[in-house]
Amino acid sequence: MNKSSMFFHMLKPFKQVTITTRQLSKESMCNDTAIEYCANIVKQYDYENFMATLLMTKALRSPALVLRAFNVEVARVQDQTSDAQTAEFRLQFWLDTLKTIYKKEQSIKNIPANPIAQELFKICKSYGLQKRQLDKLITSRSELMRTKHFKTLNDVEKYAEDSVSPIYYLLLSVAGVSNVHADHAASHLGKAQGITNILRSVRVSSYHKIVTMPMDMLMKHNVSQEEVLRSTDSENMRSVAFEIASRANSHLLMARSIDVPSISKQIFLPAISVDHYLTKLQKLNFNLFHNSLLLSSATLPFSLYYNRVLKKY
């Protein structure tokens, strides 16, 4: 069973939508079109999470697409411009938008004419989502843009907690789950996925002349920043990758070991993608720069579907 056949019936509702600035200003834009826009953003820039989201129940799927589209927009800011001030302005737009959304007795007419912002307003009001979790998705990216590196592996872990875990906390709120064990699992999964994202971004970050691998690990294994920027494979580099991947895997195992409410398991389905990457990296003896890591996994769609049916993650 291939990727396209398995997900074809789910992909059909999300037609490719291109929305111009003029179109965004129209108050008549229907809810379905806005959701399609969010879905296309996630599909284009966060495909693995998009596939996992399609396997969620209908009631959770649309809010999940909105939250992930918001996260994509925030995460992409640093890739869209090399000018730090412009990037900060774009992040400030979203911080200001959140302030507007959370004003008492707010009307959608006062929300910026942006489909993601308007859909975010709707789900925040419908589900009483915590503003601080949405704020974290922005401020974590803003802080990284200023520092441009991580001093320690613990700093990477904190960044992962702040830039990924909030999505899971918010989705649990949408699902009506108020459970300390589910929150604990969400924290560990966010850390696992966030740390893995750092590993996966090493090549891209190197292209932008940024070293995202923690300095303490590089120093411990005698790897220079220049070696990272040149994508130099070596035993020492693999030792760095091994330690970082081990931390991610430890959090993944913790997330999976916790007994959580049944509905939470579909929310935590991206754990399968994290496991796939870490397993592949291990088979490559932790060579971060192997070209096969750039290829999508042919078995991932089946694994997501299989684990969804079994209610596992």
Where is each model-derived feature located?
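Conserved donor sugar-nucleotide recognition element shared by glycan-biosynthetic enzymes
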Residues: 156
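Catalytic cores of Mg2+-dependent Asp-rich isoprenoid enzymes
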Residues: 2-14, 18-142, 160-172, 182-195, ...
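Cytochrome P450 catalytic-domain "roof"
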Residues: 145-153
